[in-house]
From Swiss-Prot:
Similarity annotation: Belongs to the dynein light chain Tctex-type family.
Name this protein carries in UniProt: Dynein light chain Tctex-type protein 2B
Known role: Acts as one of several non-catalytic accessory components of the cytoplasmic dynein 2 complex (dynein-2 complex), a motor protein complex that drives the movement of cargos along microtubules within cilia and flagella in concert with the intraflagellar transport (IFT) system. Required for proper retrograde ciliary transport.
Coiled-coil parts of chain: none
Lineage: Eukaryota, Metazoa, Chordata, Craniata, Vertebrata
Main location: other
GO MF terms held by the record: dynein intermediate chain binding
Gene behind the chain: DYNLT2B
Amino acid sequence: MSVAASFPKHTSFTMRASFAAADGLPETENNAGEPENTYILRPVFQQRFRPSVVKDCIHAVLKEELANAEYSPEEMPQLTKHLSENIKDKLKEMGFDRYKMVVQVVIGEQRGEGVFMAARCFWDADTDNCTHDVFMNDSLFCVVAAFGCFYY
């Protein structure tokens, strides 16, 4: 029995879509009711992902959150998630419009061993970028990588 045979002959499917904003485009805080241009292929210079500024932001968050932290295997999954969400929220506040932010956080126990990490991305070298920062104390190490990919 085929899939088509399982439906009555007169069955029709209807799809409805509604949009709150004019012309079906999402409203943003900057345009207050005007649709955002969807044909922008490059970010404005002031809104480009700037690795040095992002690294400073990451460093400040890590210093604040992990200054007195002790490594505990039971608590690290929650701390990792909290740090990644906190950093991503801070980056969104920095005004990188139309950028998709990806934040990767790795926390491990400090035992004097070496760790090697790598990332591979397929992106537009003119608009997309990344940065990373490392935090260490006597108990743990934390590596954060932030990727900013322009959304066309």
